[in-house]
Amino acid sequence: CQTADIVFLALHGSCGEDGRVQATLEAFGIPFTGANYLSSAIAMDKDLTKRLVAPLGIHTPQWQRVTYAQEDIPALVNDTALPVVVKPLMGGSSIGVSIARTPAELTAALEQCLDMGSSTVVLEQYVSGREIQVGYLVDRALPSIEIIPKSGFYDYENKYQPGAAEEITPA
């Protein structure tokens, strides 16, 4: 890599998205495409990202960061307004994300996160509506895309299974 003019990053997954590769390239002075290591690392932390964008006037659903153990689940379920979106604090691709509409679903979602090794989650107010994504590149917005899953919500399976979701451009 030391002779590379530039590294074109086309990575997916925790090591490719959490800033580690970017930090290594920056440490060696190798130019690369995409966000720097700090931006990548921050974006993986859902609570930190929300706290940083709120003062900029970017609205997100109400949320709370919760660290818990198995024995805390009954009280947490009792104290949480439903429906709620349960998200592991760190990570991407909607891995481990659930929408809980009942106490049983919330219990299962919290247990799933613990099974994945995530004892800290973001509990986010559920907002129903259309899912529309708009990418931003340098100084311009890209065309909007409406995403319509064939079933459920736009979770990991619907993102990566061919034909599981319809994408309409422009939205």
Language model: regions and residue ranges:
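Short connector loops/turns at beta-strand edges and beta->alpha or beta->beta junctions
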Residues: I30, G91, K159-P162
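Short small-residue beta-strand/loop micro-motif enriched in glycine and branched aliphatics
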Residues: G34-A35, S94, E166-T169
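Active-site nucleotide/adenylate-binding loops and adjacent lid/helix of ATP-dependent enzymes
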Residues: C1, I42-R130
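Conserved N-proximal alpha/beta basic substrate-recognition cap immediately N-terminal to
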Residues: C1-Q62
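Phosphate-binding site of ATP-dependent enzymes
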Residues: R101-A171
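Short glycine-/acidic-enriched loop or helix-start segments at secondary-structure transitions
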Residues: D18-R20, I95-G96, Q133
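Short glycine/proline-enriched coil/turn segments at helix->beta-strand junctions
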Residues: I30, T80-L82, V138-R140
